[in-house]
From Swiss-Prot:
InterPro entries, per the entry: Arch_Rpo5/euc_Rpb5, RNA_pol_subH/Rpb5_C, RNA_pol_subH/Rpb5_CS, RPB5-like_sf
Identification of the protein by name: DNA-directed RNA polymerase subunit Rpo5
GO cellular component: cytoplasm; DNA-directed RNA polymerase complex
Reaction catalysed by this enzyme: RNA(n) + a ribonucleoside 5'-triphosphate = RNA(n+1) + diphosphate
Function description: DNA-dependent RNA polymerase (RNAP) catalyzes the transcription of DNA into RNA using the four ribonucleoside triphosphates as substrates.
Any one of the GO BP annotations: DNA-templated transcription
Quaternary structure and interacting proteins, as annotated: Part of the RNA polymerase complex.
EC number: 2.7.7.6
Location(s), subcellular: Cytoplasm
Principal place of residence: cytoplasm
Length: 75
């Protein structure tokens, strides 16, 4: 079986710890439920991602060096 999360075109996905997440939510002045969603079964998610976690995705960008986005893991 192929592990798509290791493919060179799949951006880095990292599960945030609660302290980091609190800082991100405070910076954007939003609640966890207001974040864009990502399905639990998405093959790009790390193995330790669980429903309710927030994942930081760092990807290449044409306009900046990198773009950082956040997604809430849902069922």
């Amino acid at each position: 079986m192929v592990d798509v999360s290791q493919h060179e075109l799949v951006p880095e996905h990292t599960v945030l710890d609660e302290e980091t997440l609190d800082g991100v939510l405070a910076d954007y002045d939003i609640d966890r439920t207001e974040l864009p969603k990502i399905k639990y079964k998405d093959p790009a998610l790390p193995d330790n991602a669980e429903i309710g976690d927030v994942v930081e995705i760092v990807r290449d960008s044409r306009t900046t060096d990198e773009a950082v986005v956040y997604r809430l893991v849902i069922e």
